[in-house]
Amino acid sequence: MSLSDDVVTLRPWSRDDAGFIADASGDPAIQRYSVPHDRRGHPSPPESIAAAEALIEEFAANWRASAAMGRPSGVTFAITDAASGELAGLCGVDAWSDEDVVQIGYWLAPRARGRGYATRAVILLTRWLFELGAARVFLTIVAGNQPSVEVARRAGFVYEGTMRSHGVWRDERCDVMWFAALPTDWTHR
């Protein structure tokens, strides 16, 4: 299963992508802001190719489980440049609740930032989730991650508030910002 807008393509991960994940995971911004601050099933960045391979296997297992459940909870896409196929980052569904509320997340490798890939990936993913019946799609951002805030806003998400001391990073509390989109008011239908 792939999604594309002719600029970015979202596709399942393959074992050949492990080196990219391991390299990107060394980026300080990914380490800082991709922590499992409040996401169920959101993995910490892997620190080796072997750990990245194991994570890709976990991604594949999540796809199989989601197919059996009939909704994409825990599925993860590789973000790639549609023309070249170059890997750019990750986006996915962290959780799909019984109430059809869906949490998503994303990150980009340093070399892919500033090209609009994250915004396009979030729009593609959100559109697909609404087509599948999501009643609400939300994302959480560790306070201070301004580039991610800009992605959320450009992708049509509305800031709903900051939960103070909601998450934990390196044994310290951190504030978490909440953004959401509803199918009734989302601007990128």
Regions found by a protein language model. Give the residues of each.
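Conserved GNAT acetyl-CoA-binding A-motif
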Residues: E131-I141
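Conserved catalytic-core motifs of GNAT/GCN5-like acyltransferases
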Residues: F138-T140, V158-V176
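A generic structured-segment signal
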Residues: L90, V101-Q103, A118-T126, F130, ...
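GNAT-family acyltransferases
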Residues: M1-R111, E172-R189
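Conserved hydrophobic/aromatic "anchor" residues
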Residues: W13, F77, W128-F130, F157
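Conserved beta-strand edge residues that scaffold enzyme active sites
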Residues: R39, A143-G144, H166
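Conserved acetyl-CoA-binding loop-helix of GNAT-fold acetyltransferases
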Residues: Y106-L108, G114-E131, Q146-R154
